[in-house]
Amino acid sequence: MADISISPDEIRDALKDFVSKYEPAKAATAEVGHVLDASDGIAHVEGLPGVMANELIRFADGTLGLAQNLDENEIGVVVLGEFEGIVEGMEVTRTGEVLSVPVGDGYLGRVVDPLGNPIDGLGEIATEGRRELELQAPGVMHRKSVHEPLQTGIKAIDAMIPVGRGQRQLIIGDRQTGKTAIAIDTIINQKANWESGDVTKQVRCIYVAVGQKGSTIAAVKGALEDAGAMEYTTIVAAPASDPAGFKYLAPYTGSAIGQHWMYGGKHVLIIFDDLSKQAEAYRAVSLLLRRPPGREAYPGDVFYLHSRLLERCAKLSDELGAGSMTGLPIIETKANDVSAYIPTNVISITDGQIFLQSDLFNANQRPAVDVGISVSRVGGDAQVKSIKKVSGTLKLELAQYRSLEAFAMFASDLDAASRRQLARGARLTELLKQPQYSPYPVEEQVVSIWAGINGKLDEVAVEDVLRFESELLDHLRRNTGILTTLRDTNVLDDETVEKLSSEVDAFKLEFQTGEGKPLAAVGREDFDAIAEEDVNQERIVKAKR
């Protein structure tokens, strides 16, 4: 057996060579965990003792996850993508990053998923940076009061429930009552502002679709393209087929994209369609993470889910660029019950609500806005002066018409004041009807409402009111500068009122009724203008007695 000799010099040289090649800067450590189980879009992972809340972690197959539950021995992770490839024992590593999304003007005209990846087949998106999804809302001292109008183009809303830039205005109602239609009309109505090229007027729009059918999202995109509104709109889509985690995150993605523009001094409109489905997705995620359920099985922090989202909508101070983000969250009710858990939560967070009634919708009153319980708490300060002047009594007259209409059902005959108010109310109600995808400029809304509340439609048959309005507006567009004056000044002064009154009277002489007769030749009960003291239900009831 040969002798083994060890040379000290060789050992010394080998150690020197190893030490000379060692580079401490290239050495790294990594926390590695392992999957315990994965199902229904949720994975439980052991290990990773230093992981942060809401940190992104990466599975061995490249799939990302969001750390939610930080328990003593395991982590509850929401899988962001397909979880079929995630199996027990798979390695999981930390990324050290929180969830963020790319942002920039490249997102205009595009359809993306909740991670900001394009899904419209139009190639990659040029980005300007990244923004965290869970970003803090602006503080109290960083805000400014809402004072600029955001026109929806819908007469019933702009006149009685006005929305200002930076406001959160809830749209609430049963399914199939026109909630999405109001939101889409509002986006379409921003086209004139966009084409003006004035950054102070332009409004960038974001439509967040949560839990909608894929065909519905495609229809919305098609409607926006047909109206030429897609060029200033981004769609964030989390359809019904997506995992619950994506539906939960989609509104935050849209908000992060919008905040980038808001902090850049621009104006943004964001629509969350709808937050009921986001709450249901968050409930599913929470139950799968084994969090304790509360009322209606929702987790205890479901209020915070929506409050931290909607508080990001704001009008920023001049020091921060005076940008704004206006939020139109949508909530779906069951059987018109606005006192349920999620509806009352969101009503308490927002600055007002537009309530849509299924009974009005089925009676062909569209948009089916119930002006009795709809309210805008801050939008009045942002309302244009001209429409504020003509709409001052509109809401009161309509409310009194509704109550008098119910009273008249049980009366055998009515006095003249009651008949006048019923006739006026029926025409005002008809005047507020509006076809979908047909928003009105504010100056045309002013003319229509002025004609209604000043008795110019009292001799027009109810079935002819919308045709009378359409032909009157065509006449004013062609023959006078009244609409131009209203658009440029936003003021309805005495001189403009006098011109408008004479033009409407002249048009009435030319108008043909549905029966082909001149309006002036149609015999109708002669109603004098309603005296202010007669517009009072108590007085009418006493007169009846």
Curated annotation (Swiss-Prot):
Its recorded name reads ATP synthase subunit alpha
- Quaternary form? F-type ATPases have 2 components, CF(1) - the catalytic core - and CF(0) - the membrane proton channel. CF(1) has five subunits: alpha(3), beta(3), gamma(1), delta(1), epsilon(1). CF(0) has three main subunits: a(1), b(2) and c(9-12). The alpha and beta chains form an alternating ring which encloses part of the gamma chain. CF(1) is attached to CF(0) by a central stalk formed by the gamma and epsilon chains, while a peripheral stalk is formed by the delta and b chains.
GO MF annotation terms:
ADP binding; ATP binding; proton-transporting ATP synthase activity, rotational mechanism
Positions annotated to bind ATP: G173, D174, R175, Q176, T177, G178, K179, T180
Top EC class per UniProt? translocase
Localization terms from the record: Cell membrane
This chain's source organism reads Leifsonia xyli subsp. xyli (strain CTCB07)
Site feature Required for activity: at which residues?
Answer: S374
- Entry GO CC: plasma membrane; proton-transporting ATP synthase complex
> What EC designation does it have?
7.1.2.2
